[in-house]
């Protein structure tokens, strides 16, 4: 079945491929529309770039600069220029009358506009800005603003051409060229070239101007007029002829031309980062060595001093980058002819060579210790201990009532510290420890060790003190049994509370004082019944058996207990008076008392 499906599915496979191709084309069309929409939106979001422009209009005595046509147009947000005139947009630039004009004996034919009597002043801008060609790419700010320096004469004076849409024109014949040289109107289509104001201001050698006068435009361009100082018509005619003078091999290429609304003004400096970066470093050096053209034509320009911009790769930016890399302090200083801030890199050398120049402000590094009110050189351990002491004093202690049970010959008391129920429920392990205590020094040391080492929050400590007596049921014994148990219970309670006050434990302590004939047997039975986690006891009791490691009671519990037994042995005091010649045995039984109970004669 599978083979038949693959063998007979040739037609369906072709239709599937065609469907996939159509789907791909649809996706590509959708992506293209989306990109165009994105470019249009980005073009409206960028900040406008204010630039100054100047148009040349015809006059009776040749071409002249018209101060009323000095405009300041933004990048993309300004409304079209032709809308302010009549609201009409030229359909195509081919309908305009253009002619070639030659000025000077050796200069090539420059292209200029010969307007018809019905031509508008805004047609020249509208034809280049709103032509039927593809719109400029607006994915990047000033993407169409690619300024480049063009050499126009032997003095290497730089001019910047401007043209947005260079139309393809047919080659003009020799007769048409002769007609243009003789100032005869020609209908040949040619490329349109509009000289920027900066190009108009470039000084060249003197040359005569042979330009056919035409009627002036009907209305000036009503757009953000920025009027310069008055200019004479004769000087402008001479300067226009100087601009048109060039060699045949130095025609301005089309790739160096840009729209008129993106040209630079007569005196404005670079106003965007992209235009600054596109200028070469050679042109910057030439501008520093030679006097600026705007200074020579100060009567034609408007004095606008923009802020200084640190260009990419400049010496100032490299110096700042080196200072940042070396960690030197950036000291600001102002030059005599510049208002921008600069940084002094010599402050680091002065501070290292002579400490007097360095700042007196000491640097205090940040530490991980939390600031506290304790003014001492100790670390955070002491602060933690004092905080624990404050917490321990503030914790509540619940001391239960004393219960005396005559039938069992015992007295019981329960002590709870802190929130024991919450601690027991939240603890991962709840241990129960069994402590034998007879108020001897060894047993008190065992109690201190158990509270300080073993106990954790939620644990339970059972303290048992067994008092041996011959006949607990006797009346005389019962009368003093209760008072003795209460006295012992109070002593144990006082000692345990003293130990707990030095900790922040939330534990439960059960204290039992019992009278019994055989203390060893009773404790073994209690261990088997309670089943604690660990039994803690002292090395010896009240028998004062010196010289033995374990007493009889401790030795018995170690051998008979069903749970682990921990014997806390207190460190023995060294005897200062020692016999030098006598050897000391490890188990000295000279002072031992032999238990004669159960001996048979």
Swiss-Prot record:
* Phosphoprotein as UniProt keyword: yes
Record flagged with keyword Secreted = no
Which superkingdom does the taxonomy of this entry point to? Eukaryota
Record PTM Phosphoserine, positions in chain: 247, 281, 335
Transmembrane ranges? none
| Basic and acidic residues bias spans | 286-296, 313-325
> What is a single molecular function from GO for this protein?
catalytic activity
| Biased composition range(s): Low complexity | 141-154, 265-281
Return the InterPro entries for the record.
Rossmann-like_a/b/a_fold, Universal_stress_UspA, UspA
Ranges of Polar residues composition bias in the record: 128-137, 159-177, 199-213, 232-250, 338-356
For the region Disordered, what residue ranges are annotated?
A: 127-364
The name on file for this protein is Uncharacterized protein C167.05
An annotated GO cellular component of this protein is: cytosol
What keyword terms does UniProt attach to this protein? Phosphoprotein
């Amino acid at each position: 079945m599978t083979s038949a499906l693959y063998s007979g599915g040739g037609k369906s496979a072709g239709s599937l491929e065609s469907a996939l191709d159509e789907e791909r084309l649809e996706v590509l069309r959708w992506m293209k529309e989306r990109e165009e929409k994105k470019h249009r939106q980005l073009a409206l979001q960028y900040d406008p770039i204010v630039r100054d422009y100047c148009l040349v209009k015809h006059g009776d005595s040749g071409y002249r600069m018209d101060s009323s046509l000095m405009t300041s147009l933004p990048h993309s947000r300004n409304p079209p220029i032709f809308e302010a005139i009549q609201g009409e947009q030229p359909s195509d630039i081919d309908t305009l009358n253009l002619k070639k004009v030659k000025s000077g004996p050796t200069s090539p034919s420059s292209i200029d506009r010969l307007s018809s009597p019905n031509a508008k002043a805004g047609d020249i801008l509208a034809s280049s800005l709103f032509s039927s060609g593809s719109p400029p790419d607006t994915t990047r700010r000033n993407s169409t603003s690619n300024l480049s320096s063009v050499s126009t004469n032997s003095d290497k004076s730089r001019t910047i051409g401007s043209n947005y849409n260079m139309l393809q024109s047919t080659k003009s014949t020799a007769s048409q060229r002769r007609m243009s040289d003789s100032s005869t109107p020609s209908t040949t289509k040619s490329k349109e070239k509009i000289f920027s104001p900066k190009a108009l201001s470039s000084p060249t050698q003197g040359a005569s101007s042979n330009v056919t006068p035409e009627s002036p435009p009907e209305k000036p361009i009503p757009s953000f007029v920025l009027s310069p100082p008055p200019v004479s018509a004769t000087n402008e005619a001479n300067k226009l002829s100087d601009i048109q003078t060039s060699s045949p091999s130095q025609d301005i290429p089309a790739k160096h031309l840009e729209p008129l609304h993106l040209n630079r003004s007569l005196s404005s400096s670079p106003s965007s980062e992209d235009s600054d970066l596109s200028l070469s470093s050679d042109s910057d050096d030439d501008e520093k060595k030679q006097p600026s053209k705007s200074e020579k034509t100060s009567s034609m320009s408007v004095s606008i001093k923009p802020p200084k911009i640190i260009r990419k790769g400049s010496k100032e930016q490299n110096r700042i980058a080196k200072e940042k890399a070396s960690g030197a302090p950036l000291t600001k200083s102002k030059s005599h002819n510049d208002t921008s801030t600069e940084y002094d890199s010599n402050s680091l050398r002065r501070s290292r060579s002579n400490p007097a120049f360095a700042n007196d402000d000491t640097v205090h590094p940040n530490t991980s210790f939390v600031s506290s009110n304790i003014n001492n050189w100790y670390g955070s351990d002491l602060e933690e201990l004092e905080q624990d002491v404050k917490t321990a004093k503030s914790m509540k202690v619940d001391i239960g009532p004393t219960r005396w049970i005559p039938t069992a010959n015992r007295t019981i008391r329960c002590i709870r510290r802190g929130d024991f129920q919450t601690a027991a429920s939240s603890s991962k392990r709840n241990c129960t420890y069994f402590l034998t205590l007879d108020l001897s020094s060894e047993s008190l040391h065992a109690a201190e060790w158990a509270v300080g080492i073993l106990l954790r929050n939620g644990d339970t400590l059972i303290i048992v003190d067994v008092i041996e007596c011959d006949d607990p049921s006797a009346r005389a014994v019962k009368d003093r049994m209760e008072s003795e148990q209460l006295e012992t219970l109070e002593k144990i309670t006082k000692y345990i509370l003293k130990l707990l006050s030095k900790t922040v434990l939330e534990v439960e302590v059960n204290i039992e004082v019992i009278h019994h004939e055989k203390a060893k047997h009773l404790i073994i039975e209690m261990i088997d019944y309670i089943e604690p986690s660990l039994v803690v006891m002292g090395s010896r009791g009240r028998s004062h058996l010196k010289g033995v490691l374990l007493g009889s009671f401790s030795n018995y519990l170690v051998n008979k207990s069903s749970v682990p037994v921990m014997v806390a042995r207190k460190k023995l005091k060294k005897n200062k008076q020692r016999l030098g010649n006598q050897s000391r045995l490890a188990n000295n039984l000279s002072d031992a008392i032999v238990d004669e109970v159960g001996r048979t004669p």
